[in-house]
Amino acid sequence: MAEIFESVDKNKDGKILWDEFAEAIRVFSPQITSEEIDKMFIVLDVDGDGQIDDVEFASCLMVNGGGEKDTEEEVVMKEAFDLYDMDGDGKISASEIHVVLKRLGEKHTMEDCVVMVQTVDKDSDGFVNFEEFKIMMNSNKESH
């Protein structure tokens, strides 16, 4: 999670400004509108100061354990899942993770990505489904 934050925080000031956020989102969704980016940014900018700090970034990508459906956090997590699920089949492969991390400037090997999948792949199908993705994001948060 920290690596993703740092890759979006281009000027390395510890805050993600709207322009930095928009640039990162457009890498994956070139046709997204500014209005859609605004909605996502507002969800992440919890304190409303016009910038996203690392705590806001991490906390908003985590789903609260209360089981509420369609919370804003759940929606943001689903949008993040959809970015990784490049072929739209409802599951994420190690190669999809590798491509996304590479686009974000991360230096993970394919083997690293296979291990990421294996770590959370509870049903042993070789892919990460949405529930497993949430576990993966939570474990990333705890390890940073």
Swiss-Prot record:
Top-level taxon of the source organism: Eukaryota
Keyword Repeat: yes
Keywords carried by this UniProt record: Calcium, Metal-binding, Repeat
Binding site for Ca(2+) 1: 45, 47, 49, 51, 56
UniProt keyword annotation of Metal-binding present: yes
GO molecular function: calcium ion binding
Binding site for Ca(2+) 3: 121, 123, 125, 132
Pfam family, one: EF-hand_5
Binding-site positions, Ca(2+) 2: 85, 87, 89, 91, 96
Domain called EF-hand: residue spans: 1-31, 32-67, 72-107, 108-143
Functional summary from the UniProt entry: Potential calcium sensor.
Name used for this protein in its record: Probable calcium-binding protein CML31
Source species of the chain: Arabidopsis thaliana
